[in-house]
Amino acid sequence: MTELFDTAVTSLLHLPEVLDRLGAAAGDRRSAGDHAHHAAHGHGQHRISGIGGGAPVDIMETPGEYAFVLDVPGLSKSDIQVTLEEDRVLVMKSSNGAGNGKRKREEEEGECKYIRLERRASPRAFARKFRLPEDADTGGISARCENGVLTVTVKKRPPPEKKTKSVQVTIA
């Protein structure tokens, strides 16, 4: 009976990961509450469209830039790739072999052996793509990883100057 209980508890502990994977497979990470908020506040059209799913990303906009913030615990600078595809698609992903979800097993010393390994496998692989808006300056992209948080900043181009042209009115 204890083994059955342990299995049930372990399954429940991994439920958030399973739900994350299901949301990623569906390609949409927003909750029902998020959908309701966006519909109620007229945010139906996003300036930045996400492609695919995966790790949660916060996207912020200021007058001068866009910022993408993603948790990447356990990954080093060499494990993270940030690229630009098709001139307007920002790609953030873990490089080959990094974030495969398998934790390196500590060496058993002497007569010590593992009875159970339950700590969450870390780091997790991730891949996210975002189509950037027209005002994004693709030459002004920078990425910084600090304390397990990746921040990718995309500068905005200044808005085009509005040109006014006078048209002479003729009397017929």
UniProtKB/Swiss-Prot annotation:
The keyword rRNA processing does not apply. InterPro entries: A-crystallin/Hsp20_dom, HSP20-like_chaperone, Small_HSP. One of its GO terms (cellular component) is cytoplasm. CDD domains: ACD_sHsps-like. One of its GO terms (molecular function) is unfolded protein binding. Belongs to the small heat shock protein (HSP20) family. May form oligomeric structures. Coiled coil: none annotated. The gene is HSP18.6. It is found in: Cytoplasm. Residues 29-54 are annotated as: Disordered. Keywords: Cytoplasm, Stress response. Induction: By heat shock. Its main location: cytoplasm. Residues 48-172 form the sHSP domain. GO terms for biological process: protein complex oligomerization; protein folding; response to heat; response to hydrogen peroxide; response to salt stress. This is 18.6 kDa class III heat shock protein.
